[in-house]
Amino acid sequence: MNLQILLLLLLFCHVAAVCRDTETCIERVKEVVAAPRRFWFGEQRSALCSNRNAKSLECGGPPQLASFHSIASRLFRVKTYHSAYLRNLYIFPRVTYRASPGHYRACEHDFFSGNTSAVQADPDMDPVEPFRIRKRPEITWSGLQYDEQYTVVITDVGYATINFLAVDFPKATKILKDYEPTENYRPSPNPMVVLVFRNGRADIESPKSEEDFNLPQFMLKHELEDDLVGLSLIVASSDPFAIEKQRLRGKVDYCHSLLQKRLASNPPRHHTILHRLPIDEIDSWLSVSFDQHQVNGNVCCQRIKLPKTSIFLDPLGDVSISALTTLTPPSISSMRISSSQSNYINYHRQTRNFVELSNEKFSLAIIDAHHGHLHWLEVDIPAANLNAANGNGLTKADYVPLIPKKPSTCHSYLFVLLAQPASMQTLESYCEGMCETRKKFRLELFKQQHGLRLSALSTVSSCYDLPYAYHILMKDASQNRTMERRGSKHRSSLYSDMSSEVCAAFHVSPHHKCPISQSSFTVSIIGAVFLVVLAHLF
């Protein structure tokens, strides 16, 4: 009973939050659009972003709108806004997004939005995730006659894009620009505005570009100066869906903010090294992928089958990979956007404070997340090569595969990208293999000694699983067969003396003799020599 009362109260609060009558809604809209500090582009933003330590991504935005701080001033591109711009309003568009749950992939992670409630736009609404408003909304208003004709525009005020354009609404609606949601990547509310115009004397033309939508020019061109009669607001938050769309467009890669949020709210318990890193320094996303070779065979009395594919790390999830996949070095990429590539950077920054992309160099280190042992180190990687997933840096510590010591266990590793202030060409190279010097490597000390800044990171849990056991036992068995052949001994199948010990970790009784077999279609990663030996033996 108490639960029912609570639900009714929550429903009442939600309904009360939505303005009910047109006159009240219009007056509230006029107040909100004139507020100079309500949204991320407000007066406070220019103060926060004008100092030398401001982060370029968080301070990004269309530079042509940098001096406009309220919704109305950005819409009409005037520094001094007057209420006369909205003198003809008599319509408050009711905008409703129907529930649309679904899956999507962003920042190399799978997300699911299962919210089943509809979204009703309102000037005082709680910000809603872009994924929930990704489909064209229903638009109506009090007194709408279906034989009337209006022009409807939806524009993203923060990013100066046109997101929807329809003419002759609702009598004979013709859509000139299909609906798209906001791509708000920043963790601050961002407004979209729904504008309703009476049909003017000039025919409405489709926009030539979605970006830098200039409302005053649009109104002048189509003779709509006195025909703006309706205005409503849609307030959006950010989500991985919007972040990924910006990323795919090559504008801004803000995936790292999701990782920072995850590490802050739920830090990994056993990542001793990670706890000592300045996570707030991270300014980019690190994509890491391993090549997984095809495997088809039997080991520990079990069948294993892996396809040939690329395995991307997912630091936003708790995903493990087979140690077999880590036998060869990974591919690394990190999108770096210069001021010449995107208008979003340098929004409030001075050019003298911006480090030119062509001069940026980075170091990449892979370390044991528990003990700090160094598994790989490359320095002097050009930023342009990171964009192309082509390291081409100077190798100072050869790659050592990420292999746990015991069967049926997993171990965590960190991939760390560090921004260099200068070349590190003279850095002395490390020894080969997991030698004592590598075991004494300390990332924090290395970072401090060379004045490095943490730019990006990723994590992975590598597991000594059955596919890796297959690799180890097959390698051992082939060596045994070679020695037996030299001693004129023959066996009908491959068998490793290590099988009992290794397979016991996978709950196989030591009394079971489990031969190791390999499909003729398996692409082995043990090496060309091993393949030749097997072919000769069989």
From Swiss-Prot:
InterPro entries: PEBP-like_sf. Glycans are attached at N115. Keywords: Glycoprotein, Signal. It comes from the Eukaryota. SUPFAM superfamilies: PEBP-like. Residues 1-17 form the signal peptide. This is Uncharacterized protein C56G2.4. It comes from Caenorhabditis elegans.
